[in-house]
Amino acid sequence: MKKHIIVITTGGTIAMKKDPETGGLVPAVSGEDLAAAVPRLSDWADVSVVEFSNVPSGWMSAEKMFDLSHLIDKLSEEGKADGFVVTHGTDTLEETAFFLDMSLKTEKPVCVTGAMRGASELSADEIGRAHV
């Protein structure tokens, strides 16, 4: 029986593509897009996506971290998942991961991951993380 994993998106570079007009990265990739880009993901697990936010990680406030922790515990208590993957920007990823480690009540696994390159950049690295 396959496990059920919930991917919770928060934004960051992992959810950005290059804007053709400005050349800068802008939020443009949904959690569904990220999940669809992982080959044969459905062979490993049943995956659902919760779009929590889509902001640069520098905007991840203590209040947002608290809300994220509460959401994960709520979904866990409801028996909605066997584990969680949180996609996050790298600027504050470690702060959020530490906060979750200290605040979560659930014993279910929570993986916090990000990317250094946007989804449309050459050798984008977000998909490689899902194969580990």
List each model region and its residues.
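Active-site histidine-anchored catalytic micro-motif
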Residues: 1-131
